[in-house]
Design a protein with these regions (language model features):
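Sec-dependent signal peptide recognition
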Residues: 2-9
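Generic cytosolic/nucleocytoplasmic N-terminal low-complexity/intrinsically disordered segments
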Residues: 4, 17-19, 187
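Hydrophobic h-region of N-terminal signal peptides that target proteins for export
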Residues: 9-17
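Class I SAM-dependent transferase core
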Residues: 16-105, 116-117, 121, 136, ...
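Conserved nucleotide-cofactor-binding alpha/beta core module
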Residues: 97-197
């Protein structure tokens, strides 16, 4: 009986140590990503760099691609969609020039990664995704990871989210030929930073 009581805590300690080592490994990968891919390309906002280090990108991609999570490029997330390259996520976030009290609209939730990054920097994030399976998965994951100020919904992002206007900023992760007037009308003030994805 005493041996069983000893073995269970011992196995639990082994599991905890393994999880801690794994998380430390992910943190190192994120540090390298920020230093070599993001800072070197000119992203300077210390808050954006901090959040890019802290947001667990590996949780937002399919498990079989997990080891490539912090690589310098987009990755497939299913349904013919991708998670954006880390540098692009950081750049789009920096271009919003966030102060912390903003309400941001994201067009194209994908796996939820960009919304998670924004969540730590703004008051509220509203994210629309046209692919139902993706938005459903992203909503579950964002909630599980504790991103409570992100609201997601399924729909046509180019129509925006009229019930929640005006927005301080809008990130469009898909590249339309032209910016829909319906989105422009939902901004508090209009300023464009077109960036190739």
């Amino acid at each position: 009986m005493h041996q069983i009581k000893f073995v269970i805590p011992f196995l639990f300690c082994l599991f905890c140590a393994e999880e801690k080592t794994k998380e430390e490994w992910w943190h190192k990968k994120a540090d390298v990503m920020v230093e070599k891919q993001i800072e070197r390309r000119g992203v300077k906002d210390p808050q954006v760099l901090k959040v890019m280090r802290e947001t667990p990108r590996h949780r937002f991609i399919p498990p079989h691609l997990e080891k490539m999570a912090y690589n310098d490029g987009p990755l497939p997330i299913g349904e013919g969609q991708t998670i954006s390259q880390p540098y692009i996520v950081a750049l789009m976030t920096e271009l919003l020039e966030l102060k912390g009290d903003e309400k941001i609209l994201e067009i194209g939730t994908g796996s939820g990664y960009q919304a998670a990054v924004l969540s730590a920097l703004v008051s509220e994030v509203f994210s629309i995704e046209i692919v139902k399976n993706l938005v459903d998965s992203a909503a579950v994951l964002l909630d599980k990871l504790g991103y409570k100020n992100v609201t997601t919904r399924w729909g046509d992002g180019y129509k925006g989210w009229p019930d929640e206007t005006p927005f301080d900023g809008i990130i469009v992760t898909a590249a339309p030929d032209e910016i829909p007037q319906s989105l422009i009308d939902q901004l508090k003030t209009v300023e464009f930073h077109p960036e190739p994805l």
